């Protein structure tokens, strides 16, 4: 391990002692904001320091085993202990480097997930519905809540576009690599000849902004229109102009919201989605620049990139960024995404570790 990393770990250990001392003071709770800040810092530092303590213990075990090598009667035993200690040190070294990786400030946030049908017409819209169900089932597995923010339904039951809000700790950290092009290969229900069709959808995952106050939205930059909410096929489903469309004039971004119970609720939700989109655009620009510098495939923020194919006849799912193929399509479409998300996170961490070593 690099001396600079060892020094950093020692500093973190010293800081944990200091934070523990501060939290133990009688007046610690007099300033609740500072108390919460210290509690959060304590929770972040503790796992790092504990692993570092195990690392130093393994180093001590290695030194003891190396001393035993000089004793002929203990030589074989010492060799086994040395091998075990070196393996343990290697594992802990990797774990420590992962713990020291820079944290994404958005990882714990709720998300907006936007699914748009692309090429493939009605079949693409049906696939958009399948993707929404997949992410909803995954959210259920993680005990997250799913709210439909806006939906433009197709006549056959799918979605031309749908935006959902997923509420739960770590939602963004687990789903942020889902952004991009998703392709499906299957025989549509409307296909009489049994031919396989290829359709596509685009998924965008955006962290929810903490507060609208954090986003600079000049009222002069917004055009707000109201209209009647409509259901599938375009029929009006109420008699008041409760649906809201907000256009951000500088960027041309348009957000529509009509699923709320009132115009006020729809406007508030649309503003949240707009704030998330603007944040996301800035984030993707920074990610693209960073990814170009280190030739990253994961987390590049490129929405035009085809990231995954769902092949129904073969029952397989392939993530093209990491060359991962799983022959468990039914399980994946039912929300069993852990194997895919874990692999993507691991690959992203490997890229960050490689960058640390440069």
Curated annotation (Swiss-Prot):
<comment type="similarity">
    <text>Belongs to the prokaryotic/mitochondrial release factor family.</text>
</comment>
<dbReference type="GO" id="GO:0016149">
    <property type="term" value="F:translation release factor activity, codon specific"/>
</dbReference>
<keyword id="KW-0488">Methylation</keyword>
<keyword id="KW-0963">Cytoplasm</keyword>
<feature type="modified residue" description="N5-methylglutamine">
    <location>
        <position position="235"/>
    </location>
</feature>
<dbReference type="InterPro" id="IPR045853">
    <property type="entry name" value="Pep_chain_release_fac_I_sf"/>
</dbReference>
<dbReference type="InterPro" id="IPR005139">
    <property type="entry name" value="PCRF"/>
</dbReference>
<protein>
    <recommendedName>
        <fullName>Peptide chain release factor 1</fullName>
    </recommendedName>
</protein>
<dbReference type="InterPro" id="IPR004373">
    <property type="entry name" value="RF-1"/>
</dbReference>
<dbReference type="Pfam" id="PF00472">
    <property type="entry name" value="RF-1"/>
</dbReference>
<comment type="function">
    <text>Peptide chain release factor 1 directs the termination of translation in response to the peptide chain termination codons UAG and UAA.</text>
</comment>
<keyword id="KW-0648">Protein biosynthesis</keyword>
<dbReference type="Pfam" id="PF03462">
    <property type="entry name" value="PCRF"/>
</dbReference>
<dbReference type="InterPro" id="IPR050057">
    <property type="entry name" value="Prokaryotic/Mito_RF"/>
</dbReference>
<dbReference type="GO" id="GO:0005737">
    <property type="term" value="C:cytoplasm"/>
</dbReference>
<dbReference type="InterPro" id="IPR000352">
    <property type="entry name" value="Pep_chain_release_fac_I"/>
</dbReference>
